[in-house]
Amino acid sequence: RENSVTMYLARRAAALNALHSAIPAGSSLPRILPAAEAAYFRGMEEHHPERLCIENTRTLMLEMPFSEWTDQQVETVAVLSLDLHFNVVLVHPERFCFSSSNRRRLEELAKLPLALQVNADTLLRWGTRRQGLELLELTATPLLGSDCHDMTKRPPNLKGGREMVRRKLGEAFLAQMDENARRLTAPTLAQV
């Protein structure tokens, strides 16, 4: 695992350098923060997870396994949040509610000081909207993600997702989500 994390970080740095060199000077593009949607792996709490955090933060965007979650996996998330003081963001939790066991474990995890980041696409589809809205309301720290991978098959769609949150949960809820995002991406003074 150590080698794969190190290799990933090197590839990310090279890609970021290429991106920065392609952006014209004085561009009005948003700030780009190096980060990772880190896939859960056993023992990750012992492998310097801060290297996978959003740059200069303690925010760890964590993708849980696409399987039935175990007690050990849930315990690792608790250790990352409570003992190691990471701001854990469970990304696209709606993908893991395929079983009542995972749904129950997700509800347990949502009681911890962590965030749930629901994909905007989930809110834009009638068949998944209700679950996405319920997950946003389940956590004290709701977030909206685009899960954008390209401009065709998985394009950015935050505008539509934000509008759905505004319509269904209200302007104050959307403002709180924006504040959560600002807080979790703001540089932290001390790295624990």
Where are the regions a protein language model picked out?
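Extended substrate/RNA-proximal surfaces in nucleic-acid metabolism proteins
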Residues: 3-117
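Residue-level preference for long, well-ordered alpha-helices that form the structural scaffold
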Residues: 8-12, 154, 170
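Conserved, mostly hydrophobic/aromatic
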Residues: 92, 147, 181
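Short, glycine/charged-rich beta-strand-loop motifs at protein surfaces that mediate ligand recognition
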Residues: 94, 119-124, 148-152
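Short active-site-adjacent structural elements
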Residues: 124-128, 151-156, 185
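Short acidic/histidine-rich active-site segments
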Residues: 140-156
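Mid-to-C-terminal alpha-helical segments outside catalytic/metal-binding sites
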Residues: 158-192
